[in-house]
Swiss-Prot record:
Pfam families: SYY_C-terminal, tRNA-synt_1b. PROSITE patterns: AA_TRNA_LIGASE_I, S4. It catalyses: tRNA(Tyr) + L-tyrosine + ATP = L-tyrosyl-tRNA(Tyr) + AMP + diphosphate + H(+). It comes from Limosilactobacillus reuteri (strain DSM 20016). This is Tyrosine--tRNA ligase. One of its GO terms (cellular component) is cytosol. GO terms for molecular function: ATP binding; RNA binding; tyrosine-tRNA ligase activity.
Amino acid sequence: MDILNELEWRGAINQVTDEEGLRKLTSEDKIALYCGTDPTGDSLHIGHLIPFMILKRFQLAGHHPVIIIGGGTGAIGDPSGRKSERQLQTMDQVHHNEEALTAQMKKLFGTENFTIVNNYEWLSKISLLDFLRDYGKLFNINTMLNKEVVASRLDAGISFTEFTYQILQSVDFLHLYRHNDVQLQIGGSDQWGNITAGIDLIHKVEGPDTKVYGLTIPLMLKADGTKFGKTAGGAIWLDPEKTSPYEFYQFWINQDDRDVIKYLKYFTFLSKEEIDDLAEKVEKEPWKREAQRRLAQEVTKFVHGQEAVEEAERISKALFSGDVADLSVAEIEQGFKNMPSVDVENKKENIIIWLTDNGIEPSRRQARQDVSSGAIRINGEKVDDVDAEIDPQAHFAGKFVIVRKGKKHYYLARVK
């Protein structure tokens, strides 16, 4: 399938500057294309996957993706999608974030047929006088003010620093065209003004017939109208230390039936036939949640690898069944990260006293009732003897005791 046809089918195209010209170019030749990300944090999140999935599809089709780490622009701050001025980072913060993001991108794209560059390398060499003379003269203030990214900030105010961001991004496109043969820039729908500004700059400097293009991606909204990627608990990070692979897997498996097929098209490499088959299953047997499971498997595999998928599914199965005894210490750390936890002494104790003194049961009467009725499981085993003894050293290398009350309520006791 033609790459643009595939992107259209997957719902990944919002606007293209010259679709006919881009279609002709990509059908006749392999091109270099790019998108940029500023190092505002030390990890990518799932929002970054939106443009990166486009780059990855081009890469798999034989084209050459380039990613700019905005070491220069990141020190300035992109006003796109912002209602207020960004807080400037220190250069030490910027450099730390650059290193972390670079490592994550290499994991997603590999090292073959892929380039990472840092715009600090060329932007830092432009003096103020050169900037004003060589580039400032080529930008019309009226045109810049009419760009949505600037116009939306005029009432609240925008600093000259952020106002010049689109010039810097345009310089990036020109630099990559000259030095990396880049002919296409990819960005979110809020980047349209910055992308077209870059194309205009290239046409002014290199000639009006220069073949450069821009493509933006639709704003990703959930069926309820809220923005994709935002959760009550905050961002879903690609760094496994910030969002564990289990949490990452759970995010995807919990998607709404109304959204899951759209996400399968966008965030996986499954074929049209495979996705159509899953769409039919959502229609006929939604309670099986096969589409959600496949979505979670595919995206987790892409970001964290197959081993992380298997680990996440082991944790999920154990928590559902209550059979937690075979989980590793690392799996317990992941699976119980957001569950109630208590710190307990490393000593043997009667179960009734232990449950009550550690706040898992509100009273000894309630503890006796729950234990004698079989509602309490310790490390996966039912305990119905009120005279039983808890030994914190018995399982999980003496680090944890897992308590389950009823069918759904878990507590993680961390042994001091």
